[in-house]
Amino acid sequence: MGDSRALLDSEEYPNTEAQKDRVLTLEEWQEKWVNHKTGFHQEQGHQLLKKYLDTFLKGEKALRVFFPLCGKAVEMKWFADRGHSVVGVEISELGIRDFFTEQNLSYSEEPIMEIPGAKIFKSSSGNISLYCCNLFDLPRANIGKFDRIWDRGALVAVNPSDRKRYSDVMLSLTRPGFRYLLSVFSYDPTKHAGPPFYVTDGEVKKLFGSVCNIQCLEKVDVFEERHKSWGIDQIIERLYLFTEK
């Protein structure tokens, strides 16, 4: 990070079709957790979220905050500790249990009656509820609306063919006055198949622009040694803020 290379915009990678047919099954995601292939997890939390936390929360109290494809994101406890109510969805039961264990939180679990085979895990404090199910089944559980959505590792993990369906679900969960932070990546998609998938600025605007004002807050070169195995030499993270039009 932070070298002198120019930050490339997504338009400099013209082959936006390279990943369009790429599909990962839910079983493959669950296997990543079983096999500890969770390089996407950030033990110290997300640095750009820390930087823009005040912009995201806007000084408001007792918000409902949604974490799509939450994994064991440490930021869920950050928000709960600040007095907010956190709801997440994750296909891996292992990931959810790891979250509660690693954060030293006691919890209960119960079936979600509206979704066969699904469960909800609730912290004993009552302000963290994690749904173990397919995200696309979640609306059937009537989880209500949210003031804030933190979308990191979610849109970029959804199969490209499911993005419109995904954005429709996300927008259906927003309350009036919502604020939505989205993190996406730009890299050469002909060299790495994903996930995380390459998402262009144009795609972000197509998916969310009809309902949201869209502001790109920052672009950061996040290239690390592990990215060399992807066959790339640069990866740019873009952080967007969506607000209600």
Swiss-Prot record:
Cleavable signal peptide: none
GO molecular-function terms, A-Z: S-adenosyl-L-methionine binding; thiopurine S-methyltransferase activity
GO cellular component, one term: cytoplasm
Binding sites annotated in the UniProt record for substrate: 40
One GO biological process term: methylation
Gene3D superfamilies, sorted: Vaccinia Virus protein VP39
The name this protein goes by in its record: Thiopurine S-methyltransferase
Membrane-crossing residue ranges in chain numbering: none
Protein's UniProt keywords contain Acetylation: yes
Quaternary state and interactors: Monomer.
Enzyme class: transferase
This protein's UniProt keywords: Acetylation, Cytoplasm, Methyltransferase, S-adenosyl-L-methionine, Transferase
Compartments, as annotated in UniProt: Cytoplasm
Domain of life (superkingdom): Eukaryota
Family matches, as InterPro entries: SAM-dependent_MTases_sf, Thiopurine_S-MeTrfase, TPMT
Residues the record lists as binding S-adenosyl-L-methionine: 29-40, 69, 90, 152
Reaction(s) the record says it catalyses: S-adenosyl-L-methionine + a thiopurine = S-adenosyl-L-homocysteine + a thiopurine S-methylether
SUPFAM superfamilies according to UniProt: S-adenosyl-L-methionine-dependent methyltransferases
EC number: 2.1.1.67
Family according to the record: Belongs to the class I-like SAM-binding methyltransferase superfamily. TPMT family.
Annotated source species: Bos taurus (Bovine)
Keyword Methyltransferase recorded: yes
Record-listed N6-acetyllysine modification sites: 58
